[in-house]
Amino acid sequence: MLLLLLGILFLHIAVLVLLFVSTIVSQWLVGNGHRTDLWQNCTTSALGAVQHCYSSSVSEWLQSVQATMILSVIFSVLSLFLFFCQLFTLTKGGRFYITGVFQILAGLCVMSAAAIYTVRHSEWHVNNDYSYGFAYILAWVAFPLALLSGIIYVILRKRE
């Protein structure tokens, strides 16, 4: 049981790190001399030094992506806190339903954010000289891992 708890805890912390990095890092779209994330657009010199950064667009779809990414981080942190609370207060044989629900909500939020960004980013960047950055990919990787850990929490029973 201890190994199972350590495994699910490791998976949860990995999801949390993926969510934090994908929300914060400026690598959602990368192209010729520019990087874009949820918060700002940056142009870079040929040597890779940042020359100019300006705030991202105020379009509604981007604000919804920002909000759902923040919600996913909040739900995942709350889920981790609830897991520790339930670990010490739950009766023997009880399930971690609340923890699992919040982790599944975190997964659904990050999936919604990445899907909206995938569909709508072409309105923001009209040229096609870009590719998806590693933060965008980390967001998509966090989605199934968060769902998996949420499902494991729902199935998991507490033992002594």
UniProtKB/Swiss-Prot annotation:
Ubiquitinated by the DCX(DCAF13) E3 ubiquitin ligase complex, leading to its degradation. Keywords: Cell cycle, Cell membrane, Glycoprotein, Growth arrest, Membrane, Transmembrane, Transmembrane helix, Ubl conjugation. One of its GO terms (cellular component) is plasma membrane. InterPro entries: PMP-22/EMP/MP20-like, PMP22, PMP22/EMP/MP20/Claudin, PMP22_EMP_MP20. Residues 1, 92-95, 157-160 are cytoplasmic. It is found in: Cell membrane. The chain crosses the membrane at residues 2-31, 65-91, 96-119, 134-156. GO terms for biological process: actin cytoskeleton organization; adult locomotory behavior; adult walking behavior; aggresome assembly; apoptotic process; autophagy; axon development; basement membrane organization. It is a multi-pass membrane protein. Signal peptide: none annotated. GO terms for molecular function: cytoskeletal motor activity; protein serine/threonine kinase inhibitor activity. Found exclusively in the peripheral nervous system. Present in both myelinating and nonmyelinating Schwann cells. Found in the tumors of Schwann cell lineage where axons are present (neurofibromas) but not where axons are absent (schwannomas). Gene3D superfamilies: 1.20.140.150. Glycans are attached at residue 41. Its main location: membrane. Induction: Strongly down-regulated in the initial phase after sciatic nerve injury. It comes from the Eukaryota. Pfam families: PMP22_Claudin (PF00822). Residues 32-64, 120-133 are extracellular. Disulfide bonds: none annotated. Might be involved in growth regulation, and in myelinization in the peripheral nervous system. Belongs to the PMP-22/EMP/MP20 family. This is Peripheral myelin protein 22. The gene is Pmp22.
